[in-house]
């Protein structure tokens, strides 16, 4: 799909389709009014007859409108003008693109980017439109033998901006959006891959592909032998029950061209989580292939980063592992020695993500990082607390937390900060080891982050719990690509190349 921007009046557009908005109740947007005037009231006459009310998401496709150069006009319901918000805007764009894809139009000029969305500028509207369009067109069908195809797939969409002065802003928005969308697609493709294909070795292969494709990237793989030498007893214990070797992929992006401190992203990469000896219930266990969503998100963010060619140093860590039951698996009651030297009593082998992450978080101390952000499908408690809309954010460093919250608002990939008070640390106490890997039934998301915080004393750190946001269940099951957009926005902001609100 090709995207671009232009600045022009609707009556001069010669296209397969021109897209304009209609508000509720039957109120034409400014662009639609111009088309109505040229067509001598053709559009407003249809609205008076009740063909379109203007409710959000309604679509009406018109052919051969009098005096209009374009073959088709697509009227898009945008709801009440004053109530159009970010969520509605994205939904409208997604439905518009899907509708266009079914009409047989191979290209279209879209004026929805001129709609007023409260508090948002043209950069945001164009970027969100491109990201939403790419998201709506995504399908994971690489393993299907029969693939559905649109009769004449949409190939090009042009978003209109109000003035020529805004063209450079719109062009930058398209450029940023395409890079981010590419990262999101990478994240989705890897996360959606079945666990018999996507194991830790597969994750490592994907990390190596980035090195092969981009000059500023180098990738190294830490195998179990090296983990043993490093004393990563916690990480190794989790993978002990699987025939698939645990592998940690280190992706280094040297964008600054100097020795400035890197930002480090650490992704939990449990390519399948059966729960181990503390076996999960059978219902929905197929979705535990998504327990590597953190690693997929970091890989996607690194892909977007290299596409954007940002002038900063970033390291992505994919902590690949598989948690399986076997005679060699670790057990409840085991006491593990982590890379940091701290000991952990295992109360439940299904609280394994933190055991992998704690050693990865200790490992990254060697990079003398500017900041470390770990990303993990860590706790079911986060799904209970925040549902599928907000990623859980916990941090021991207020400025970093505020940066991430700002990036989440800018990108529309929302997060919500939860407390990380010392009061919760007591729930991890153990009579036999330094602490346990489980904090009890209460405040599960917070106690999991409290556990991780004990391994992050040497740098500024934040934790993103994406258990509720990494994938969708049900009929439309699949990876969402989150939090690639938020992470990339954070990196854009850090590089000084952000644009927009």
Swiss-Prot record:
This is Probable cytosol aminopeptidase. It comes from Colwellia psychrerythraea (strain 34H / ATCC BAA-681) (Vibrio psychroerythus). Its main location: cytoplasm. Keywords: Aminopeptidase, Cytoplasm, Hydrolase, Manganese, Metal-binding, Protease. One of its GO terms (biological process) is proteolysis. It is found in: Cytoplasm. It comes from the Bacteria. The keyword S-adenosyl-L-methionine does not apply. Binds 2 manganese ions per subunit. It catalyses: Release of an N-terminal amino acid, Xaa-|-Yaa-, in which Xaa is preferably Leu, but may be other amino acids including Pro although not Arg or Lys, and Yaa may be Pro. Amino acid amides and methyl esters are also readily hydrolyzed, but rates on arylamides are exceedingly low; Release of an N-terminal amino acid, preferentially leucine, but not glutamic or aspartic acids. Belongs to the peptidase M17 family. Its EC number is 3.4.11.1, 3.4.11.10. InterPro entries: Leucine_aapep/pepB (IPR011356), Macro_dom-like (IPR043472), Peptidase_M17_C (IPR000819), Peptidase_M17_leu_NH2_pept (IPR023042), Peptidase_M17_N (IPR008283). The active site is at residues 280, 354. Mn(2+) 1 binds at residues 273, 350, 352. One of its GO terms (cellular component) is cytoplasm. Mn(2+) 2 binds at residues 268, 273, 291, 352. Presumably involved in the processing and regular turnover of intracellular proteins. Catalyzes the removal of unsubstituted N-terminal amino acids from various peptides. It is an enzyme of class 3 (hydrolase). One of its GO terms (molecular function) is metalloaminopeptidase activity. It holds the Pfam family Peptidase_M17. Its cofactor is Mn(2+). PANTHER family: CYTOSOL AMINOPEPTIDASE (PTHR11963:SF23), LEUCINE AMINOPEPTIDASE-RELATED (PTHR11963).
